[in-house]
UniProtKB/Swiss-Prot annotation:
Its cofactor is [4Fe-4S] cluster. It comes from the Bacteria. This is 3-isopropylmalate dehydratase large subunit. Heterodimer of LeuC and LeuD. GO terms for biological process: L-leucine biosynthetic process. The gene is leuC. Belongs to the aconitase/IPM isomerase family. LeuC type 2 subfamily. Catalyzes the isomerization between 2-isopropylmalate and 3-isopropylmalate, via the formation of 2-isopropylmaleate. It is an enzyme of class 4 (lyase). [4Fe-4S] cluster binds at C308, C368, C371. InterPro entries: Acnase/IPM_dHydase_lsu_aba_1/3, Acoase/IPM_deHydtase_lsu_aba, Aconitase_4Fe-4S_BS, Aconitase_4Fe-4S_dom, HAcnase/IPMdehydase_lsu_prok, Homoacnase/IPMdehydase_lsu, IPM_dehydratase_rel_enz, IPMI_cat. It catalyses: (2R,3S)-3-isopropylmalate = (2S)-2-isopropylmalate. One of its GO terms (molecular function) is 3-isopropylmalate dehydratase activity. Its EC number is 4.2.1.33. It comes from Geobacter metallireducens (strain ATCC 53774 / DSM 7210 / GS-15).
C-alpha cells in the first residue's frame, strides 16, 4: 500500500512512538517569533534549561509588532533578541531586516520538500506548500523543539482535495481556499493534513500555493501540503543549485516525497473551480462565505492588503493592476504592508508602491501588526475592514471591529468603490 506525503515524512523522521498513534519526529526547522517564543524562553530559563538543540536549525524573527509600539512589546522583542544572541542563532531577523515569518523564511530558502517544521504560530501550515510537514504548536511543544529538536504528533490522516478546472477571471488562490473552507467548515479537517492536488494547483505559483496552505488551519487542518514539482525546484533553485547537478536531478529527489498513486486517504474531495466567483467572508468565522454577487455593496471603513496570506509580490501586482490610475474612495482608509523587505524593494522597483500611494494607500513596513489588531491598522469599535488576511474572528483586528476576508483583487476593487466590490469589472 502506498503512502501519502505526510506518511512518508513521518516515517523518515520517526524517533519514538511512546503511545499508539503518537509519533515523535525529528525536526528540520524550528521557527520563532517575538509573540510566542518569549514564553517558552522564560520557562526554559526558569527550569535551568536555557539551551538550543542546534542553532543552525532555528530561524527567528521579530515580525508581529515591529518596530515595538510600547514597553511590553519592546520587552518581548528584547527577550527574543537577547536569546538569539546568547545562542549564536545566525538566522535572526531584527528591525530593518525583518518580515512576516511565513513569507520571509520561504524567501530565504529555509524550507525544502520532506522537511518537518514547527513554530508557535498556527499559520505555520503555510510551508506545506513546499511538500513539507509544517505545523503550529503550543508553548510546551515549542520548548521541547527548541531544547531537543523533536516534537510529538498524532498519526497523520490526509484529506485529498482535488482542485479541477481552470480559475476564472478575477478568481485567485484566496478565493479557492475560502470556498474550500466554506464547504468543509471550520472543523472539517481537524487534526488532518489537507493535501491540495489537481491541475489548478499544478498551474499555481509557489506564492499561490502558500496562500492555499496558509489557511488549512482555518478548516481545522494540522497542515496543508502541495506536491513538490518543477515549480518548487525553480523557486528554490537559487538556494540549492550547488547541491544538484541539474534542476532535473533536484526534481527527481523532490518527487520521492510526492504521495504514491495508491496512497490511502481518509477522504477525497473534488471541486470544480471553473464555476467560482470571487469569494468573501460575511460573519465571524472563516467558513461563513458568500460569492461576491451576494455581498457586493456592503460598506467598509478600511482596506488592508498584506499578511502571511497575501502580502507577497504576486498579490501586490494583482491589486496594483486594478488600482493603477485610480483613487480609493474618500470614505476608506487603505493600508498596504508588503510582507518582507525584498517584496517591498521589488514592488518599488516595479513601480507598484507608487501606484498604491498615488491611489491613496498608506504603505507600512513589513509587519503582522494589523492582522491581529496590535498595530498599523487597528479598527475602532463598529468599524469594518476588507482584508487579505486569514482570520475574521470577532475583534480580530480591533475590539468591536468586523473583518471581511477576500483576495487582493477584491480588496483593491473594494478600496476604489468604498463598498465590497467585484474585481472582475476592473480586469
Amino acid at each position: 500500500m502506498g503512502k501519502t506525503t505526510a506518511e512518508k515524512i513521518f516515517a523518515s523522521h520517526l524517533v519514538d512512538e511512546p503511545f499508539s498513534g503518537t509519533k515523535v519526529l525529528r525536526l528540520d526547522v524550528v521557527m520563532c517569533h517575538e509573540i510566542t517564543t518569549p514564553i517558552a524562553i522564560a520557562d526554559l530559563m526558569a527550569r535551568g534549561k536555557d539551551r538550543v538543540f542546534d542553532p543552525t536549525k532555528i530561524k527567528a524573527v521579530i515580525d508581529h509588532v515591529t518596530p515595538s509600539k510600547d514597553s511590553k512589546t519592546a520587552t518581548q522583542a528584547k527577550m527574543l533578541r537577547d536569546w538569539a544572541r546568547r545562542h549564536a542563532i545566525k538566522d535572526f531577523f531584527d528591525v530593518g531586516h525583518n518580515g512576516v515569518c511565513h513569507a520571509l523564511f520561504p524567501e530565504k530558502g529555509y524550507i525544502r520538500p520532506g522537511y518537518t517544521v514547527i513554530m508557535g504560530d498556527s499559520h505555520t501550515c503555510t510551508h506545506g506548500a513546499f511538500g513539507a510537514f509544517a505545523a503550529g504548536v503550543g508553548t510546551t511543544d515549542l520548548e521541547v523543539g527548541i531544547l531537543k529538536g523533536v516534537c510529538a504528533f498524532r498519526e497523520p490522516k490526509s484529506i485529498r482535495i482535488n482542485l479541477n478546472g481552470t480559475l476564472p477571471k478575477g478568481v485567485y488562490a484566496k478565493d479557492v481556499i475560502l470556498y474550500v473552507i466554506g464547504q468543509l467548515g471550520v472543523n472539517g479537517a481537524t487534526d488532518r493534513v489537507m493535501e491540495f492536488r489537481g491541475p489548478v494547483v499544478d498551474a499555481m505559483t509557489m506564492e499561490s500555493r502558500m496562500t492555499l496552505c496558509n489557511m488549512a488551519i482555518e478548516a481545522g487542518g494540522t497542515s496543508g501540503i502541495c506536491m513538490p514539482d518543477m515549480v518548487t525546484v525553480e523557486y528554490l533553485w537559487p538556494f540549492i543549485e550547488n547541491e544538484y547537478p541539474s534542476k532535473e536531478a533536484a526534481l527527481a529527489e523532490f518527487s520521492t516525497w510526492r504521495s504514491d498513486d495508491d496512497a490511502v486517504y481518509e477522504r477525497v474531495l473534488d471541486f470544480d473551480v471553473s464555476v467560482l466567483e470571487p469569494i468573501v467572508t460575511f460573519g465571524y468565522k472563516p467558513d461563513q462565505v458568500k460569492p461576491i454577487s451576494e455581498i457586493a455593496g456592503s460598506p467598509v471603513d478600511q482596506v488592508y492588503l498584506g499578511s502571511c496570506t497575501n502580502g507577497r509580490l504576486e498579490d501586490l501586482r494583482i491589486a496594483a493592476r486594478i488600482l493603477k490610475g485610480k483613487k480609493i474612495a474618500p470614505s476608506v482608509r487603505g493600508i498596504l504592508s508588503p510582507a518582507t523587505p525584498k517584496i517591498y524593494k521589488d514592488a518599488m522597483a516595479e513601480g507598484l508602491i507608487d501606484i498604491f500611494m498615488e491611489a491613496g494607500f498608506c504603505v507600512t513596513n513589513p509587519t503582522c501588526g494589523a492582522c491581529l489588531g496590535m498595530s498599523n491598522g487597528v479598527l475602532a469599535e463598529g468599524e469594518v475592514c476588507a482584508s487579505t488576511t486569514n482570520r475574521n474572528f470577532m475583534g480580530r483586528m480591533g475590539k468591536g471591529g468586523m473583518v471581511h476576508l477576500m483576495s487582493p483583487a477584491t480588496s483593491a476593487a473594494t478600496a476604489i468603490e468604498g463598498v465590497i466590490a467585484d474585481p472582475r469589472k476592473y480586469l
